[in-house]
UniProtKB/Swiss-Prot annotation:
This is Inosine/xanthosine triphosphatase. InterPro entries: ITPase-like_fam (IPR029001), Non_canon_purine_NTPase (IPR002786), NTPase/PRRC1 (IPR026533), YjjX_NTPase (IPR050299). The keyword Cell inner membrane does not apply. Binds 1 divalent metal cation per subunit; can use either Mg(2+) or Mn(2+). Mg(2+) binds at D38, E68. It is an enzyme of class 3 (hydrolase). SUPFAM superfamilies: ITPase-like. The keyword Nucleus does not apply. One of its GO terms (molecular function) is nucleotide binding. GO terms for biological process: nucleotide metabolic process; thiamine metabolic process. The lineage of its organism: Bacteria, Pseudomonadati, Pseudomonadota, Gammaproteobacteria, Enterobacterales.
Length: 179
């Protein structure tokens, strides 16, 4: 059984991680555990590089907290220009898989607050009245009227980040021949 450490205690992220690992390895082969670790980046990461750094840092911290695990998973949401997205980073002892989620263009009413230094989740709570929205459907759920959720979008990106761990083509070593 794989011990999978989710570098988060956010239920929406843990559910996405669980669904992806179950899809790839089967429910009977996975045990998911969430741990509270720091991302090492601002609470609202700006830009792809800062956001991916946050996801990688989460994995690094989770490895320190649970070194005996088989997999460590970091998910970090960020904003780049006018879009929200997230980076997924998955590691085991030998490999790293990474993927970026789909992006959603945010309305100016949200971006204004972000430019003033507030988090997306705080702005969504202010405008919708839904408490702790980032642990639920998130901005994606609100703007798609529930057709998508933070969990469903992250689930797809996590499936892509898992590809190097199970697809045999990724295991082929490149050999060069000299003549």
């Amino acid at each position: 059984m794989y011990h999978v450490v989710a570098a988060t205690t956010n239920p929406a992220k843990i559910k996405a991680i669980s669904l992806a690992f179950i899809d790839v390895f089967g429910a009977e082969n996975c045990r998911i555990e969430g741990v509270d670790v720091d991302s090492g980046v601002p609470r609202q990461p700006l830009g792809s590089i800062e956001t991916r750094t946050g996801a990688r840092n989460r994995v690094m911290m989770a490895r320190q907290v649970r070194p005996e695990a088989n997999f460590w998973v970091g998910v970090e949401a960020g904003i780049e220009e006018s879009m929200t997205f997230a980076w997924m980073v998955i590691e085991n002892a030998n490999l790293r898989g990474e993927s970026r989620s789909a992006s959603l263009v945010l309305p100016e009413s949200i971006l204004h607050g972000i430019r003033e230094g507030r988090e997306l989740g705080d702005e969504m709570e202010r405008l919708t009245g839904v408490q702790n929205i980032k642990h639920k459907g998130g901005a994606i759920g609100v703007f798609t009227d529930g057709k998508l959720s933070r969990t469903s979008v992250y689930h797809q990106a996590l499936l892509l980040a898992l590809v190097p761990f199970h697809n045999p083509i990724y295991q082929i070593s490149v050999q060069t021949t000299t003549q």
